[in-house]
Swiss-Prot record:
It comes from Mesorhizobium japonicum (strain LMG 29417 / CECT 9101 / MAFF 303099) (Mesorhizobium loti (strain MAFF 303099)). Transmembrane segments: none annotated. The gene is pyrD. Belongs to the dihydroorotate dehydrogenase family. Type 2 subfamily. This is Dihydroorotate dehydrogenase (quinone). It holds the Pfam family DHO_dh. Catalyzes the conversion of dihydroorotate to orotate with quinone as electron acceptor.
Amino acid sequence: MSVLDRLGQKLLFAFDPETAHGLSIAALRCGLPAGTRAVRDIRLKVSLCGLDFPNPLGMAAGYDKDAEVPDALLGLGFGFAEVGTVTPLPQAGNPKPRIFRLTADEAVINRLGFNNEGHAAAEKRLAARKGRPGIVGVNIGANKDSADRIGDYERGVGRFARHASYLTVNISSPNTPGLRNMQAREQLGELLSRVMAARASAATQPPIFLKIAPDLVEAELEDIAAEVVEKRIDGIIVSNTTISRPPLRSGDVGRETGGLSGKPLFERSTIVLAKMRKLLGPGIAIIGVGGVDSAETALEKIRAGADLVQLYTGMIYAGPALPGRIVAGMARFCETERLKSIGELRDSHLDRWASKPLS
């Protein structure tokens, strides 16, 4: 981390996490943070689901909830950015405080609860960037008090299909009561059927990804994989935050309710990723997320079966230069290992990760 990055982090860490997040969004809107411009290397290009990603590193959903700064994020060196989660109606989310830094663990616990400005606000911003280059996905969710949560996802597809490079169906946040129950096979089957029907009726038909939780057992993973294959979903994102608590060094704050992200999530999310790759086979796209904070952790996700990777929490601790550094590290790895494409690395550690228990 550079001196400027350290100073910026120290300044932001002087504020509570939610205020710091708002300041970082405002800074990106003004063009203030200077990231490390990502190298353009043909070996890092990934063609997936009809999209050409300039590199495999993306910004995960949860940072730019209301589609305020997707182009600024791409300017930091990300190969793609995912905005949201957006719900049909605006909602305030859960009571504050609801974000907690676990600095000793380079982790965060959040219980935000899909706080966002709603479909209309996000759609207006995304419509305004029409014609600009860059891959921007939209992560869609359901309102907490909705009487028809599946209908909320249908509305999300209908609203954003023409604006999104891809859509992510997020049913894995732990902070909306009952949402994760939609991962159960019967509910999931109905959800995916209706989502795919909504896409079929849209004028534009972007790829559909399903974002799953890391807190699943083998039988649940098998059910999800079966539904993904049967309903012809384009890909999955593994994984959301975890409600489990691996050994942490951050004391009482580590016992806060909510989803844990960052470095402690890497192991379990990568095991789930590999197990899903085994279940889905080689042809379905997988985006790996959870604990990515360096070129090596990003590369290991790919070795475990990911086509693309995402990060968020890592940038809280390493600053806006992180995506550029990771992409440069990936390019150096390709050069050192004489790879013609980063895709050659995929699945090279698949058996190692897939054989680990979900403990």
